[in-house]
UniProtKB/Swiss-Prot annotation:
Originating organism: Brucella abortus (strain 2308)
GO BP term, pick one: nucleotide metabolic process
Keywords: Cytoplasm, Hydrolase, Nucleotide metabolism
Record-level Gene Ontology MF annotations: nucleoside triphosphate diphosphatase activity
Protein name per Swiss-Prot or TrEMBL: 7-methyl-GTP pyrophosphatase
Catalytic reaction annotation: N(7)-methyl-GTP + H2O = N(7)-methyl-GMP + diphosphate + H(+)
EC number: 3.6.1.-
Cofactor: a divalent metal cation
Entry-linked InterPro entries: ITPase-like_fam, Maf-like
Length: 199
C-alpha cells in the first residue's frame, strides 16, 4: 500500500530537496497565523527550538486534517541570536537591519520537521546549525542586498547559503539540510520507518 505524502509548505526550496531525493509528494499550505501561534510561546519562555517545532507541528496537523490518511510533513525554521528571534524581513530596509545585527556574530538556525496523520503527530525532530557571520560593513551589505534582490526577503536572516549568501559567513557548524530548512536525513529515516518510502 502506498501512503500519500503531503508537504505542508509552498517553499520551492523544500520541494526541490524532496524532489531531488526522489520522493513523490504533493504540497498544500497550512492555514495558520504563525505570529498568533508564536506570541504566547515567547511570553511563556519557549526556546527558539520549541517555537520551530510547535509551528512545524501546527502546519502538519492543519494540513493532515484536510488530507485524511495522508502523512503530512510540516517544517519551520527560526533564527535566534541570544534571546532574540528573527523573522523573514518584510522589506529591504528590514533585511539590511537584520544583516547589520547578525554581522560578526554567531547565530543559531533551528530547523524543525514533523510528521502528522489525521490530526495526530507521528514524529517530531529539531536540528540546529551555528552560523558565524563575517564582519560586514554597511557598503558590502548594501551591495549584497542590491545583488540578491527579493531573495533577501524569502529567508529568515536575509540570506540563502546555496547562493551568494554563502559569502557572508566565516564558519558554519551544522548539516546543510538543517541550514536550508529541512532536516532531510532524519526525515528520510522516519519515512522509511513509517513505510512511506522504500527502504
Amino acid at each position: 500500500m502506498t501512503v500519500k505524502l503531503v508537504l505542508a509548505s509552498k517553499s520551492p526550496f523544500r520541494s526541490a530537496l524532496l524532489k531531488n531525493a526522489g520522493i513523490e509528494f504533493s504540497t498544500a499550505s497550512a492555514d495558520i497565523d504563525e505570529r498568533a501561534v508564536e506570541a504566547p510561546l515567547y511570553e511563556s519562555g519557549a526556546t527558539p527550538e520549541d517555537v520551530a517545532q510547535i509551528l512545524a507541528e501546527a502546519k502538519a496537523i492543519d494540513v493532515s486534517e484536510k488530507n485524511p490518511g495522508a502523512v503530512v510533513i510540516g517544517c519551520d525554521q527560526t533564527l535566534s541570536l541570544g534571546d532574540e528571534i528573527f523573522h523573514k524581513p518584510h522589506d529591504m530596509e528590514a533585511a539590511r537591519r537584520q544583516l547589520q545585527k547578525i554581522s560578526g556574530k554567531t547565530h543559531q538556525l533551528n530547523s524543525a520537521v514533523v510528521l502528522a496523520r489525521d490530526g495526530k503527530t507521528l514524529w517530531r525532530h529539531v536540528s540546529i546549525a551555528h552560523m558565524t557571520m563575517r564582519d560586514l560593513d554597511a557598503g558590502f551589505i548594501g551591495r549584497y542586498i542590491g545583488r540578491v534582490g527579493d531573495i533577501a526577503l524569502s529567508s529568515v536572516g536575509a540570506y540563502q547559503v546555496e547562493g551568494p549568501g554563502i559569502q557572508l559567513f566565516e564558519k558554519i557548524d551544522g548539516d546543510y539540510f538543517t541550514i536550508v530548512g529541512l532536516p532531510l536525513l532524519p526525515l528520510l529515516a522516519e519515512l522509511r520507518r513509517e513505510k512511506c518510502i522504500d527502504g
